[in-house]
């Protein structure tokens, strides 16, 4: 992967440093670190950081392979940039970057200064000379393995840090929204999936702390659990100046931005034609581009007030799973305010003014603003055309019903009456008169929240419903549905669709729907799926042949005799969980599928002891209960001050990955020994409540921390500000979590949890194949991108076909494969796997699997079992198998069983 790409006329940073990272599964140093001798002279060197804020230089995990050699080594992140082809420094992202100049450029002409000298193209955090609105700040600590203490390639520099001022804390009461709350949605037929998990107290051996590294300074009345991984988090994190993506709109606090000269709320909507793309990959069929990114910071409209100046504050109120409120005040504690209800999919951007003079601005510039009458009583409509030829509608609903008589002052400002109380709404209109008619009928109404209900029937059909809470005039709501919603609408909801669509940043076209609820249906849920290998459509459990059993017995002794404590008692919840689950799957295979209980007995007892260490909270880095945001987190950051320890666990990164492995391990332990459940059930339920709670009234944990029921998948990023929004890299570990709670629910007797896991798997099977796993006929991602087959890392604002730990194809594709589990063939369709294999890993393809080295090779061949179980079996059963190709979080025992389970004929050695 090239560390930079020059695009004429484009000044866009694509930096993986600013995002939440995902740990890789045990590649070796040689896989990811290139020396100068290995690189061609023409290829720019990767940038290696000597130290990154938030990334520990300690070796977090060194489990031995069967020969006793480490199978994971710390390695650097490959960094990628889109930079300038002229005038470096003219526009600066406030993150580490590399300016590439033309040969004729003079360093002294740069507006970027580094360490007191003009920028000469070195990687750095910019200190912008003469641009006060751009602040220096350090990248958010990210989830990738620690950087090596000695750089092995490329440039070296020490990262800078700065602490942003959190700003004043709002102390006045929350601005009220006149709501029309709906009754809790009625439970649908079948098993209710949102029943409370047993509400045990936090175990006494998990200490409570009130000093979380990230303060809730910008949240109003932060008393109960606060959602940490949701779409609006940028509004209360860092400088509060990164974008929030409501889909299809984007919102950003202007906060004195010089382009808009405003402290109001900026709104934009990006068309596909505005995207920037990366370089084509000529090694893949179709030469797909490596990434695409939507521009941020376009301020098509800004809803502000003349009173909003340098003293303006923004706070967030009522943060929920689907909604929140962003509140602007002229000064902290002021009763005058503008309140913005934030709800995923909202058709209007709504601003509720309380005694302020509206100032509606545009950095794109107004070409035409014309009054357009009153579509409803008390509503005043204006039609706006901007200089980019885009059409917007503006509706004013004064509390007193009087004509606001908005005035256009130049091409940047529309002013309203002083002391205005009422509602102003804006919406982009892509559909001319038809679009106007749709918006006109719903103007004055706005969503304030979404209530969700759901059930799963015994026939394998799951249903979930969004009931929109609203306020205002009472008209039916305009809400935008993503493609996976539209695909799964029931018949009644299909009738709410309108002939109006707006593009989203990374999920295709959103469809306008008019109504106060949606109901989605997922059929063919994997109710029969258990711990054994499983095939879609199968209603029975796999029985292994005698040949397969004998082959597994022959290798079981080596793996089950490994030092379990050494591989599970680690200073990382993530890697400890992977180690525990590795042994759990192997023990289950030997005891239940092979039928050798004697061989499994000793390792089973060892696994119980290893798990008990965590239940007793005596692992290397114990858990604590965070009493600020409300959750169970690693104590590492509290003790060492490094927010990147255990990949940001303390700041709620990736809890569904980390805790999912523990939950799945517990499900297997409880299956193998039901008596084990009594002493351990409360601990495991605590992990489920933290990462994926089923209710919103639990005093200890928020509802559904990771899984986003609107987007249909999880977000991995926690309390880190991010210019491109939330993101997720490993779809397969997302499905692992859903499978884990399904199986823990089954083992522990929680029917609601089991049903919820089944429905989550069904939703994931749909969303992953719409947005992440791209078959040739995918219509939601750009045609020039789908040849990559997987997204790599999907953000709310961009998609980059890479990983946080390297750009080898086996890394990028493989992180969407592991861990191989019974659910893998359900969410990774055979059609997709076949297309991906032929394009990437077949003999003669871009990266033939037979030439891959290390643990990724085993991941690829285990994945091959979905379409060619015979070839997969032969690879793992070969007597001369290179054991280093078995990932440290997997076992040969399970890989053999998985291939045999998918193989429909008798396996003879």
UniProtKB/Swiss-Prot annotation:
Entry's localization field:
Secreted; Secreted, Cell wall
Q: What InterPro entries does its record include?
A: Endo-beta-glucanase, GH81_C, GH81_N
Q: Where is this region: (alpha/beta)6 barrel subdomain?
A: 539-909
GO cellular component terms listed in the entry, alphabetical order: cell surface; extracellular region
Chain spans, region May provide specificity for triple-helical beta-glucan: 798-800
Which class of enzymes does this protein belong to? Answer: hydrolase
Single GO molecular-function term?
Answer: glucan endo-1,3-beta-D-glucosidase activity
- Please state, per the UniProt record, what induces or represses the expression of this protein: Expression is down-regulated in presence of human keratinocytes.
Where is the region beta-sandwich subdomain? 191-430
- The entry annotates sugar attachment on 159, 239, 259
- The GH81 domain, residue ranges: 191-909
| Enzyme Commission code(s) on record | 3.2.1.39
Q: Where does (1,3-beta-D-glucosyl)n bind?
A: 658, 727, 729, 733, 811
**Span list, region alpha/beta subdomain:** 431-524
Sequence ranges of Polar residues compositional bias: 155-180
Q: Where is the signal peptide?
A: 1-23
The highest taxon in the source lineage is Eukaryota
**Record key words, sorted:** Carbohydrate metabolism, Cell wall, Cell wall biogenesis/degradation, Glycoprotein, Glycosidase, Hydrolase, Polysaccharide degradation, Secreted, Signal
- Chain residue ranges for the region called Disordered: 136-187
The protein's annotated catalytic reaction(s) are: Hydrolysis of (1->3)-beta-D-glucosidic linkages in (1->3)-beta-D-glucans
Describe the family membership recorded for this protein in Swiss-Prot or TrEMBL: Belongs to the glycosyl hydrolase 81 family.
Describe the function of this protein.
Cleaves internal linkages in 1,3-beta-glucan. Probably involved in cell separation after cytokinesis.
Q: Protein name, please?
A: Glucan endo-1,3-beta-D-glucosidase ARB_01444
């Amino acid at each position: 992967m090239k560390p930079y790409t020059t695009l004429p006329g484009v000044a866009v940073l694509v930096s993986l440093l600013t995002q939440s990272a995902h740990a890789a599964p045990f590649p070796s140093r040689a896989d990811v670190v290139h020396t100068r001798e290995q690189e061609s002279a023409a290829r720019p060197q990767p940038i290696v950081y000597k130290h990154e804020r938030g990334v520990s230089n300690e070796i977090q995990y060194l489990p031995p392979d069967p020969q006793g050699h480490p199978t994971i080594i710390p390695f650097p992140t490959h960094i990628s940039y889109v930079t300038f082809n002229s005038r470096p420094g003219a526009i600066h992202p406030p993150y580490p970057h590399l300016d590439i100049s033309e040969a004729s450029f003079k360093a002294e002409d740069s507006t970027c200064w580094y360490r007191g000298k003009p920028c000469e193209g070195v990687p750095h955090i910019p200190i912008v000379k003469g641009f006060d609105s751009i602040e220096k700040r350090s990248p958010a600590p990210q989830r990738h393995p620690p950087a090596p203490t000695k750089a092995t390639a490329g440039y070296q520099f020490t990262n800078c840090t700065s602490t942003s001022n959190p700003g004043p804390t709002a102390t006045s009461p929350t601005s009220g929204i006149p709501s029309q709350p709906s009754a809790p949605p009625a439970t649908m037929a079948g098993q209710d999936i949102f029943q409370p998990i047993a509400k045990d107290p936090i175990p006494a051996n998990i200490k409570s702390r009130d000093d979380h590294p990230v303060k809730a300074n910008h949240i109003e009345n932060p008393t109960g659990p606060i959602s940490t991984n949701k779409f609006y988090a940028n509004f209360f994190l860092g400088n509060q100046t990164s974008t929030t993506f409501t889909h299809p709109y984007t919102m950003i606090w202007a906060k004195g931005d010089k382009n808009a000269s405003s402290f109001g709320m900026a709104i934009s909507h990006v068309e596909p034609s505005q995207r920037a793309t990366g370089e084509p990959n000529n090694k893949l069929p179709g030469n797909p581009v490596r990434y695409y990114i939507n521009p941020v910071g376009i301020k098509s409209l800004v809803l502000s007030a003349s009173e909003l100046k340098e003293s303006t504050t923004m706070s967030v109120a009522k943060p929920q799973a689907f909604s929140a409120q962003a509140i602007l005040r002229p000064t902290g504690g002021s009763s005058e305010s503008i309140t913005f209800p934030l709800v995923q999919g909202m058709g209007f951007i709504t601003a509720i003014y309380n005694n302020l003079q509206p100032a509606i601005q545009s950095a794109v510039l107004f070409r035409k603003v014309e009054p357009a009458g009153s579509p409803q009583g008390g509503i005043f409509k204006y039609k706006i055309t901007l200089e980019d030829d885009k059409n917007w509608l503006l509706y004013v609903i004064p509390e007193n019903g009087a004509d606001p008589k908005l005035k256009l002052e130049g091409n940047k400002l529309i002013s309203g009456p002083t002391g205005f109380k009422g509602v102003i709404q804006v919406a982009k209109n892509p559909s001319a008169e038809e679009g106007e008619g749709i918006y006109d009928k719903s103007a004055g109404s706005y969503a304030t929240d979404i209530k969700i209900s759901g059930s799963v029937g015994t026939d394998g059909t799951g249903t979930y419903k969004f009931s929109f809470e609203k306020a205002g005039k009472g008209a039916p709501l305009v809400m935008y549905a993503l493609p996976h919603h539209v695909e799964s609408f029931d018949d009644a909801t299909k009738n709410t669709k309108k002939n109006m669509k707006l593009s989203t940043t990374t999920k295709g076209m959103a469809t306008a729907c008019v109504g106060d609820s949606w109901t989605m249906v997922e059929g063919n849920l994997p109710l029969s799926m258990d711990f054994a290998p499983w095939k879609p459509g199968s209603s029975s459990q796999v029985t292994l042949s005698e040949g397969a059993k004998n082959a597994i017995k022959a290798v079981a002794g080596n793996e089950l005799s490994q030092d379990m404590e050494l591989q599970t008692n680690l200073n990382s919840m993530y890697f400890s969980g992977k180690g525990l689950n590795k042994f759990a799957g192997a023990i289950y295979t030997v005891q239940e599928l092979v039928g050798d209980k004697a061989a499994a007995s000793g390792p089973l007892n060892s696994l119980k002891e290893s798990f008990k260490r965590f239940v007793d909270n005596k692992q290397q880095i114990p858990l604590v209960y965070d009493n600020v945001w409300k959750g169970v987190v690693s104590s590492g950051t509290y003790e060492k001050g490094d927010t990147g320890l255990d990949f940001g666990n303390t700041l709620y990164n990736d809890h569904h990955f980390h805790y999912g492995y523990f939950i799945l391990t517990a499900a297997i332990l409880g299956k193998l020994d039901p008596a084990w459940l009594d002493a351990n059930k409360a601990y495991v339920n605590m992990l489920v409540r933290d990462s994926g709670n089923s209710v919103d009234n639990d005093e200890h944990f928020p509802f559904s921390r990771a899984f986003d029921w609107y987007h249909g998948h999880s977000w991995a990023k926690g309390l880190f500000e991010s210019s491109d929004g939330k993101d997720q890299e490993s779809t397969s570990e997302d499905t692992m979590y859903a499978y884990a709670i399904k199986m823990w629910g089954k083992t522990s007797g929680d029917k609601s949890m089991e049903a919820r896991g089944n429905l989550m798997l069904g939703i994931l099977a749909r969303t992953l194949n719409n947005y992440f796993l791209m078959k040739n006929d995918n219509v939601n991602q750009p045609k020039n991108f789908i040849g990559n087959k997987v997204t790599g890392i999907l953000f709310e604002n961009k998609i980059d076909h890479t990983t946080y730990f390297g750009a080898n194809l086996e890394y990028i594709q493989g992180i969407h494969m592991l861990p191989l589990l019974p659910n893998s063939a359900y969410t990774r369709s055979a059609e997709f796997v076949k297309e991906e294999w032929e394009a990437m890993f077949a003999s003669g393809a871009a990266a033939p699997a037979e030439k891959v080295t290390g643990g990724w090779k085993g991941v690829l061949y285990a994945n091959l079992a979905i379409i060619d179980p015979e070839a997969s079996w032969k690879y793992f059963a070969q007597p001369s198998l290179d054991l280093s190709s078995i990932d440290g979080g997997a076992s040969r025992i399970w890989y053999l069983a998985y291939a045999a389970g998918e193989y429909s004929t008798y396996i003879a050695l």
